[in-house]
Amino acid sequence: MSVLTKQLIYDIYVRLLHLNEQKANTSLQQFFKEAAEEDVIDVPKNMTSIHVIDCIGQHEPINNTGIFRKMNLSKANVTKISTKLIKEGFINSYQLTDNKKEVYFKLTRKGRQIFDLHEKLHKKKELAFYQFLDSFSQDEQNAVLKFLEQLTSRLEAEQTDDT
């Protein structure tokens, strides 16, 4: 591969990172808009809280350690977010009868509304992404898959090195 091609790939990668940052802000506004259309009035104010609700909804019952492992957040951040979500009425905490040490979380009715809306929006985006992938041959999809797997592994390793 030529140096020019490598530079082009890197430039597009950096552009993708910037677009992803911008998209995060747009996604939250889109979520608020969809929530209003569905008459869901009370919505968490950031996407991380919405994603914690999603994680809890997918894995009930789940504790802080489970959330931190599945979402790659710090334990302190998970504790802060879960405390806020309890206070705001999106989740409840409880202990299992056979384990009084661990605190587990489950969604409230209000949290379930957020979970359901988030799932609906993700399904819509997932379908659009699959349709986009259909424009590539199987060999091209395999190359993209290999690239993304290796890039993700590298970024995860860098993140681990930074902590």
Predicted feature descriptions by range:
Residues 86-138:
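Charged, amphipathic alpha-helical coiled-coil/dimerization segments
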Residues 13, 23-24, 43, 64, ...:
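Gram-positive cell-envelope targeting signals
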Residues 60-103:
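Canonical helix-turn-helix DNA-binding module
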Residues 29-73:
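N-terminal helix-turn-helix DNA-binding core of bacterial DNA-binding proteins
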Residues 14, 18, 50, 65, ...:
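Generic detection of well-ordered alpha-helical segments
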Residues 1-44:
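N-terminal leader segment of winged-helix/HTH proteins
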Residues 2-9, 120, 124-163:
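Terminal interaction helix/tail motif
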